[in-house]
Amino acid sequence: MAGDQSVIWQEGPWEHRFVPSNGSRFHVVLAGPDDGPLVVLLHGFPQFWWAWRHQVPVLAAAGYRVAAMDIRGFGGSDKPPVGHSTPTLTADVGGVIRSLGSGTAVVVGHDFGGLLAWSMPVLEPDVTRAIAVLGAPHPVSLLRVRNSLTPLTRAFITRIQVPWFPERALRERDLVTRVITAASAPGRAVPPEEIAAYRAAMSLPSVAHTSLEHLRWLVRSTPRPDGRRYLAAMSRPITVPVLSVRGGRDRLAPAAAFADDAEHVHGPLRTAVVPAAGHLLPEEAPAEIADLLLEHLATLP
């Protein structure tokens, strides 16, 4: 499937649509009734919307309008060479919600999609009803504990700061397989179709580069004015309902990384641990994650 766009357009109980937002075009997978409450799903690295394939039909069957979008730089969405800051990507999500005609949405994010979910109530409060975050500490908490992240995570973040060599490894040296395997719980047999889909999506033009740019911004921006402004904004309290879930066998984000999250939430906060799962929660624990999301959604006013 290398370089084959069909991996992005996989068929299922959903429809594919391009949605304009923030001066760009985004590929969004939609399911559920048009008048249902909107739930936006944001994937992590090195994935695309397909990471949510198990949850999309479950949430839609429960009456929600589900939008699983490819984040800027991934999948079928636009891949500009620059402009991959967290505030920009957060504005992308806000624009998609507006373009879909919904007043507000519950934003669910995994991995760095979770960092965007955390950012939504602060940077896009008018369209954010609630959030759910999987495997992602609050951005300020993450900065505080970055030295206590696992050696695996620190090594990856350091290596991708070098230009071009990580891109080549993603395209040609099977780095995608290694990342997916490392992010899974120890001993997990990663389904071959999962590896094949993510390798194919990473081999699409420009994706190996643009998919890394947000991760690079997170590191490089911390001493710069744009990064300091973002972190200052994220110090404001979050008042919308929050669900935070982590995997009990997550080798990338240890439990200590989440310890300060409650300091940033001044509204309802529920935390949960999926004991047998690693970092790839939507795929390692599809039923458990669907149930947790449905429980969270059911509590919202």
Language model features with spans:
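Charged catalytic carboxylate motif
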Residues: 51, 92, 210, 288, ...
